[in-house]
Amino acid sequence: MSKRDYYEVLGVSKSASKDEIKKAYRKLSKKYHPDINKESGADEKFKEVKEAYEALSDDQKRAQYDQFGHTDPNQGFGGGFGGGGDFGGFGFDDIFSSIFGGGTRRRDPNAPRQGADLQYTMTLSFEDAAFGKETIIEIPREENCETCKGSGAKPGTKPDTCSHCGGSGQLNVEQNTPFGKVVNRRVCHHCEGTGKIIKNKCSDCGGTGKVKKRKKINVTIPAGVDDGQQLRVPGQGEPGVNGGPAGDLFVVFHVRAHEFFERDGDDIYCEMPLTFAQAALGDEVEVPTLHGKVKLKIPAGTQTGTKFRLRGKGVQNVRGYGQGDQHIVVRVVTPTNLTDKQKDIIREFAEVSGNLPDEQEMSFFDKVKRAFKGE
């Protein structure tokens, strides 16, 4: 897409003076500034106006543009001015914040503010995560200094109001811009935005008003928490500032793996090894669950991969929406290190059965054969 003529963009003639260019730019930039104009395409027009002004307000760039237009043989006016300049060192965004009142409001440094949140990682056993528990944790956190009551000043003294900002925590900074002089507000570097100067600092906290301590906190872990979930403990974060509320503590859970169980949501999965005889003849076996051992009937002819479900033997939903199930997957164990007698028995079994698979296995092998024959 070809660029429009810069003079056309600003609506001025090629003989326009600097003042005329500046006046046109101020009018158009106010019209299309994104903080003022919410119409579609206003942002692009604003960038176009800004780019045109950057080119025509500089004598050297204007002369090059008048000679070469947009196709500059030097690949841009001394490094380019395609909307990315900073207007010679003054903050463009600050200018419009001052003009249009769209800047971020500075907070009152003496206003109450909530303390910072804290995070603590807790490692749980598989069982503790499933059933929940009450425990005590110890966390390092900042607390208000008891000696100075959080003021940072030596007992018997008070912080002075900052003489540079008058206690506001902000300074007015005057800048020269294309629109004239603009006043911006900055954080006072003398008091670091607090509005106060502490001349006689508390010896215990060094003037910060805070001290590091280890705090013991009772935590109730709900049943059913899972790895990566977190628990919010209100009011147990860092203390507030200027009488504001304390932050919160977030306890993040890491659940250790179990040697027998695996978890998927509220359901539990485990593998049950069976001997060849148990799988072939059937049996009644004891299955471990989180809630104790239960008896499970294994029907004759059970194959590897067969699944059984124990309803209600999983994990309680952490939000109270019922209970999960336990899923048992059978794995038939092939015997190894057989004695001579055992080998003879298996050979005899093979001879009696004719070394042929049963009906279920026959149907499977038939399907394989048909697949190879292309049937």
UniProtKB/Swiss-Prot annotation:
Keywords: Chaperone, Cytoplasm, DNA replication, Metal-binding, Repeat, Stress response, Zinc, Zinc-finger
Span of zinc fingers (CR-type): 132-214
PROSITE patterns registered for this protein in UniProt: DNAJ_1, DNAJ_2, ZF_CR
Named cofactor requirement(s): Zn(2+)
Cofactor annotation comment: Binds 2 Zn(2+) ions per monomer.
Entry keyword annotation includes Metal-binding: yes
Binding site for Zn(2+) 2: 162, 165, 188, 191
Subcellular location(s) of the protein: Cytoplasm
Main localization of the protein described in the UniProt heading: cytoplasm
Domain of life, source organism: Bacteria
Ranges where the J domain occurs: 5-69
Binding site for Zn(2+) 1: 145, 148, 202, 205
Pfam families hit by this protein: DnaJ, DnaJ_C, DnaJ_CXXCXGXG
CXXCXGXG motif repeats: 145-152, 162-169, 188-195, 202-209
GO biological process: chaperone cofactor-dependent protein refolding; DNA replication; protein refolding; response to heat
GO MF annotation, one: zinc ion binding
One term under GO cellular component: cytoplasm
Recorded domain comment: The J domain is necessary and sufficient to stimulate DnaK ATPase activity. Zinc center 1 plays an important role in the autonomous, DnaK-independent chaperone activity of DnaJ. Zinc center 2 is essential for interaction with DnaK and for DnaJ activity.
Subunit annotation: Homodimer.
Similarity field: Belongs to the DnaJ family.
Function: Participates actively in the response to hyperosmotic and heat shock by preventing the aggregation of stress-denatured proteins and by disaggregating proteins, also in an autonomous, DnaK-independent fashion. Unfolded proteins bind initially to DnaJ; upon interaction with the DnaJ-bound protein, DnaK hydrolyzes its bound ATP, resulting in the formation of a stable complex. GrpE releases ADP from DnaK; ATP binding to DnaK triggers the release of the substrate protein, thus completing the reaction cycle.
Protein name: Chaperone protein DnaJ
Taxonomic source organism: Bacillus velezensis (strain DSM 23117 / BGSC 10A6 / LMG 26770 / FZB42) (Bacillus amyloliquefaciens subsp. plantarum)
